[in-house]
């Protein structure tokens, strides 16, 4: 098995390409080891010293490390953990479906939200996935779009610029009802996240 690696715009995050499917659909974000209990792959990666986050995509894995840990020391152990996982035949996530990022939408906002999601899915998410991350929609309220940045995008030094200059400008250009785009910080309780977005 040959695993390629790619750097990301976030110097604390590295993208691993195992050459096979990681998740059949969706993405999975594990910002800490406690959240990784449903993923044998993420658990193995959190077992490597200095790992602070794991993100799984369709055909890639991104790993975020502490600043004090050097990639030259962590990378061989991470490659070994990924190889061991795929050779074991285990699933990346135990019997769990990809998370559903849909939110309740008022009837008057349904068309706008549909346009927002279409632009995110066709223009934004593919570009962000190339950098080892993802952006998910979490709400639209009075002109404000709420998004969550995951994987290499979470904590990336250029994430604010991506959000404001890239995504916000794109959405405002095509959808005049959009006035602002805000990023939600990671909150482990999804019901609390939904309350913040609306």
Spell out what each predicted region is.
Residues 107-157:
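Strongly charged, low-complexity linkers/loops
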């Amino acid at each position: 098995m040959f695993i390629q690696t790619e750097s990301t715009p976030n110097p604390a995050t590295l993208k691993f390409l195992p050459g096979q499917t990681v998740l059949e659909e969706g993405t999975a974000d594990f910002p800490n080891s406690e959240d990784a209990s449903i993923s044998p792959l993420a658990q193995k990666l959190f077992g490597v010293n200095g790992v602070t986050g794991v993100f799984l995509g369709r055909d890639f894995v991104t790993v975020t490390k502490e600043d004090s840990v050097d990639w030259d020391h962590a990378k061989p152990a991470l490659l070994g953990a990924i190889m061991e996982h795929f050779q074991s035949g285990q699933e990346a996530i135990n019997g769990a479906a990809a998370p559903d990022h849909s939110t309740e939408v008022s009837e008057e906002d349904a068309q706008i939200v549909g346009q927002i999601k279409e632009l995110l899915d066709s223009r934004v998410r593919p570009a962000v996935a190339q950098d080892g991350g993802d952006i998910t929609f979490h709400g639209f309220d009075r002109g404000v779009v709420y998004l969550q940045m995951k994987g290499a995008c979470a904590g990336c030094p250029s994430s604010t610029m991506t959000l404001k200059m890239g995504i916000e400008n794109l959405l405002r250009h095509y959808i005049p009802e959009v006035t602002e785009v805000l990023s939600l910080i990671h909150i482990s309780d999804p019901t609390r996240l939904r309350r913040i977005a609306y």
